[in-house]
């Protein structure tokens, strides 16, 4: 069956327009359109609905066309030809890998298909995106080839969706109003085959889908003078502008030709959310506590060549991203530290702006490298009162609690001594009976009581006299010194008040 399918495809690719129209009319398909559109429909028909009657009709049309050649002695098997090589405009073909036509119905970027090359060139590869699960490859990474010396170039691409793909898109859930989970996305990157490439837009990019322009992510605003604004290069969703049927879709990519080479690819993907990735991480990414404990021992193992011995390492239970207590502690396997960050907030931040950089060591921490620390998860459930722990050399741990600052206030009760207020009442005392006794006639009794308490071994109370202050005490000392001087010198002589002339007495 596979050999017959390959033979039928080779026959279809060598048909003329009239042969293609007869074949499509035989099965009741539309016969209108350009030749590459007719070839697309015929290849789609052969790949997914190749019945014995259809194969017989293809063979009949082929033998009718090549009747004279088949009558010649020594007929040779038909060689695979390019679908548009015989009836196409003389335009520059694309450079790229060998094409499997049944998989892609419209690999006619820049208007031409491609001949299979004998020397297999390495293909352009794109990095895997955690939030996009690839379902089908609609167009392999294909280089954008300029057709003229103009700076602004246009590259068209024509393809059709299979009924199964259309059904998947229609039956998928909505992530938000008008946005399906299953999408047809366009990805653009540099034409570099040395390593997987990240998405990168060419200058002056514009994407048109079936006569309607598709929105492309804009630039981030830059507040720094002289710094070019950056653009988030992400997959471009084309689903809302496509024909969700067997009709042919046409995509035109407009781009600026400034010396760099770019490639485009089309994929059918399922977009995931941060909750989906978190659930997957909890399922397959949890590291056993014993393995984490062995890692701690390895970190704290005594190195004979080192003069400094590490007896413990402190790990904070606060997430460095949001300064909150960890709920799902995780880190990358490539990180050398034991400090973890919260997987919930890390995935949410990368869903909004994908960077995938570790917030602890600022090194790449891709989703495929993330693990959930089982030991730290267990510690979080057991140690609720501390925000920091210390791992010890034998693999155990202890909580680090914040030390309270020493207080300057006295430990015992304070007795307030003072004179009676204006109403003749004694001031309030912290200990009933003691303050009033000291300020009244019964102070001796209270003093005896205080002495008795000291003799019984109890700590005495601190006595503070609030009626004394620095100013009053200094004045009292000055008055006492003046009185002493007066007593020593005797009575002072009377001073005579000088009388000024010109003054009139008041009386």
Swiss-Prot record:
Zn(2+) binds at residues 335, 337, 358, 361. There is a cross-link at residues 35, 128 (Glycyl lysine isopeptide (Lys-Gly) (interchain with G-Cter in SUMO)). Sumoylated. Lys-35 is the main site of sumoylation. Sumoylation is required for TCF4 sumoylation and transcriptional activation. Represses LEF1 transcriptional activity. SUMO1 is the preferred conjugate. Ubiquitinated by TRIM32 upon treatment with UVB and TNF-alpha. Its main location: nucleus. Pathway: Protein modification; protein sumoylation. GO terms for biological process: cell surface receptor signaling pathway via JAK-STAT; central nervous system development; hair follicle development; limb epidermis development; negative regulation of canonical NF-kappaB signal transduction; negative regulation of DNA-templated transcription; negative regulation of protein localization to chromatin; negative regulation of transcription by RNA polymerase II. InterPro entries: PINIT, PINIT_sf, SAP_dom, SAP_dom_sf, Znf_MIZ, Znf_RING/FYVE/PHD. Residues 426-507 are annotated as: Disordered. There is a cross-link at residues 9, 35, 56, 59, 68-69, 118 (Glycyl lysine isopeptide (Lys-Gly) (interchain with G-Cter in SUMO2)). Widely expressed, with highest levels in testis. Also expressed in vascular endothelial cells, in primary keratinocytes and in the CNS, including cortex, olfactory bulb, spinal cord, thalamus and trigeminal ganglion. Low expression, if any, in liver and lung. A motif (LXXLL motif) lies at residues 20-24. SMART domains: SAP. Residues 12-46 form the SAP domain. Keywords: Acetylation, DNA-binding, Host-virus interaction, Isopeptide bond, Metal-binding, Nucleus, Repressor, Transcription, Transcription regulation, Transferase, Ubl conjugation, Ubl conjugation pathway, Wnt signaling pathway, Zinc, Zinc-finger. It catalyses: S-ubiquitinyl-[E2 ubiquitin-conjugating enzyme]-L-cysteine + [acceptor protein]-L-lysine = [E2 ubiquitin-conjugating enzyme]-L-cysteine + N(6)-ubiquitinyl-[acceptor protein]-L-lysine. It is an enzyme of class 2 (transferase). One of its GO terms (molecular function) is zinc ion binding. It is found in: Nucleus, PML body. GO terms for cellular component: cytoplasm; nuclear matrix; nucleoplasm; nucleus; PML body; transferase complex. The modification N6-acetyllysine is found at residue 107. Residues 434-450 have a biased composition (Gly residues). The modification N-acetylalanine is found at residue 2. Residues 474-489 have a biased composition (Acidic residues). The LXXLL motif is a coregulator signature that is essential for transcriptional corepression. Interacts with AR, GATA2, LEF1, TP53 and STAT1 (IFNG-induced). Interacts with TICAM1. Interacts with MTA1. Interacts with PRDM1/Blimp-1. Interacts with TRIM32 upon treatment with UVB and TNF-alpha. This is E3 SUMO-protein ligase PIAS4. It comes from Mus musculus (Mouse).
